[in-house]
Amino acid sequence: MDAVAFEDVAVNFTQEEWALLGPSQKNLYRYVMQETIRNLDCIRMIWEEQNTEDQYKNPRRNLRCHMVERFSESKDSSQCGETFSLIRDSIVNNSICPGEDPCQSAECEEVIMGHLSLNSHIRVDSGHKPHEYQEYGEKPHTHKQRGKAFSYHHSFQSRGRPHTGKKRYECKECGKTFSSRRNLRRHMVVQGGNRPYKCKLCGKAFFWPSLLRMHERTHTGEKPYECKQCSKAFPFYSSYRRHERMHTGEKPYECKQCSKALPDSSSYIRHERTHTGEKPYTCKQCGKAFSVSSSLRRHETTHSAEKPYECKQCGKTFHHLGSFQIHMKRHTGDRPHKCKICGKGFDRPSLVRYHERIHTGEKPYECKQCGKTLSHSSSFRRHMIMHTGGGPHKCKICGKAFVYPSVCQRHEKSHSGEKPYECKQCGKALSHSSSFRRHMVMHTGDGPNKCKVCGKAFVYPSVCQRHEKTHWRETI
């Protein structure tokens, strides 16, 4: 099973084969490939029914057309018998059910498997050009819920189905239901746990070869998608499209509950979960649930003792490279993400977004019990304690409740006497990382952030800035 990629639907000729084609045949080839590229974004999530190794065994795997005969320059030069495999069955299979009768083109008597394939074939036979994307022409099919426009009616239908709320396809193994057959097939592969495609460099395994190809770019550094406006390059097409919308400001997905506009479908789905509270990703070890799969993957690493990323300045270790990089910015004082309104700098883009809500007044978190709206999820959780009378995370020893699991874990260490942070210089053990960092300053007598007035050194830039304000008050 494989995601549809450009390589899967492209038609390739050798130089010798290309030389045998006439001008009209070459024009036909260009036309078909242009349409394929334009619609690749619509079809990229359609999954194949069978493994790659079976794709040539099944006679239904290829859709054969004799368009060359219809598009040759001279009527006398037709009937060449040449066939071209234009689009793999992975695309048209979505509209072909078992036992479906083949369709016949009234124009040229060619027998074609599948109504979708027939419609596409008739358009080419008649010379009719399908609707194109907005930059090329009109998009006649508009999604009523999201307001997104599509060039093809079948693309519109496939996008429209998930919003009906009906989930007709059920997994017999776990009982989970899905809105489309392809999502069920995708789930079944993941449920089976078989990952046959392995990276030769690091050994990581994947369900589909397309995911393996994408992963390999993290090793090679290949970035084939380049932004025409700022020349920034991206390894994945989805990343490139998200970046492009930053320039255009395009946000085609609108939330029904709060009217917030979002640039892509994945952001839209994640945002919807902030309203519904849905957390479909559950940790098998502790049962904790998450709204996005990346959060689950990050959480799962906390069950392993391995923390490969260590800060050389304070000795703190991390499970993730991203967390380590954020931590290092606190030492260096690097704040590359600036607020567009007031210019204030932050070390993370998420903090900029939170800060900008102060200017815009946006409050996306609404309490269902009293109707109060809040700008940040942390404020929302604190507010909910007023209604519930406690946090969701309780100490196993004394029963004290906490809003955050990290605070609860830190509290539990005070009962157990656990002190995981050990100073390599004097052997002293401490229970919290903040205490350990303060202790390390006693040995070094120095920190990377120095006061511009008196030269005193600090571990954190925020503490240094707070100290500098004491000098400023003295001058008043």
UniProtKB/Swiss-Prot annotation:
<comment type="similarity">
    <text>Belongs to the krueppel C2H2-type zinc-finger protein family.</text>
</comment>
<feature type="zinc finger region" description="C2H2-type 7">
    <location>
        <begin position="309"/>
        <end position="331"/>
    </location>
</feature>
<dbReference type="GO" id="GO:0045944">
    <property type="term" value="P:positive regulation of transcription by RNA polymerase II"/>
</dbReference>
<feature type="zinc finger region" description="C2H2-type 10">
    <location>
        <begin position="393"/>
        <end position="415"/>
    </location>
</feature>
<protein>
    <recommendedName>
        <fullName>Zinc finger protein 563</fullName>
    </recommendedName>
</protein>
<feature type="zinc finger region" description="C2H2-type 8">
    <location>
        <begin position="337"/>
        <end position="359"/>
    </location>
</feature>
<dbReference type="InterPro" id="IPR050329">
    <property type="entry name" value="GLI_C2H2-zinc-finger"/>
</dbReference>
<keyword id="KW-0677">Repeat</keyword>
<dbReference type="GO" id="GO:0000981">
    <property type="term" value="F:DNA-binding transcription factor activity, RNA polymerase II-specific"/>
</dbReference>
<feature type="domain" description="KRAB">
    <location>
        <begin position="4"/>
        <end position="96"/>
    </location>
</feature>
<dbReference type="GO" id="GO:0000977">
    <property type="term" value="F:RNA polymerase II transcription regulatory region sequence-specific DNA binding"/>
</dbReference>
<feature type="zinc finger region" description="C2H2-type 12">
    <location>
        <begin position="449"/>
        <end position="471"/>
    </location>
</feature>
<dbReference type="Pfam" id="PF01352">
    <property type="entry name" value="KRAB"/>
</dbReference>
<keyword id="KW-0863">Zinc-finger</keyword>
<feature type="zinc finger region" description="C2H2-type 1; degenerate">
    <location>
        <begin position="101"/>
        <end position="125"/>
    </location>
</feature>
<keyword id="KW-0804">Transcription</keyword>
<feature type="zinc finger region" description="C2H2-type 11">
    <location>
        <begin position="421"/>
        <end position="443"/>
    </location>
</feature>
<keyword id="KW-0479">Metal-binding</keyword>
<dbReference type="InterPro" id="IPR036051">
    <property type="entry name" value="KRAB_dom_sf"/>
</dbReference>
<feature type="zinc finger region" description="C2H2-type 5">
    <location>
        <begin position="253"/>
        <end position="275"/>
    </location>
</feature>
<feature type="zinc finger region" description="C2H2-type 9">
    <location>
        <begin position="365"/>
        <end position="387"/>
    </location>
</feature>
<dbReference type="GO" id="GO:0005634">
    <property type="term" value="C:nucleus"/>
</dbReference>
<feature type="zinc finger region" description="C2H2-type 2; degenerate">
    <location>
        <begin position="169"/>
        <end position="191"/>
    </location>
</feature>
<feature type="zinc finger region" description="C2H2-type 4">
    <location>
        <begin position="225"/>
        <end position="247"/>
    </location>
</feature>
<dbReference type="InterPro" id="IPR001909">
    <property type="entry name" value="KRAB"/>
</dbReference>
<dbReference type="Pfam" id="PF00096">
    <property type="entry name" value="zf-C2H2"/>
</dbReference>
<keyword id="KW-0238">DNA-binding</keyword>
<comment type="function">
    <text>May be involved in transcriptional regulation.</text>
</comment>
<dbReference type="InterPro" id="IPR013087">
    <property type="entry name" value="Znf_C2H2_type"/>
</dbReference>
<dbReference type="GO" id="GO:0008270">
    <property type="term" value="F:zinc ion binding"/>
</dbReference>
<feature type="zinc finger region" description="C2H2-type 6">
    <location>
        <begin position="281"/>
        <end position="303"/>
    </location>
</feature>
<keyword id="KW-0805">Transcription regulation</keyword>
<dbReference type="InterPro" id="IPR036236">
    <property type="entry name" value="Znf_C2H2_sf"/>
</dbReference>
<keyword id="KW-0539">Nucleus</keyword>
<feature type="zinc finger region" description="C2H2-type 3">
    <location>
        <begin position="197"/>
        <end position="219"/>
    </location>
</feature>
<dbReference type="GO" id="GO:0006357">
    <property type="term" value="P:regulation of transcription by RNA polymerase II"/>
</dbReference>
<keyword id="KW-0862">Zinc</keyword>
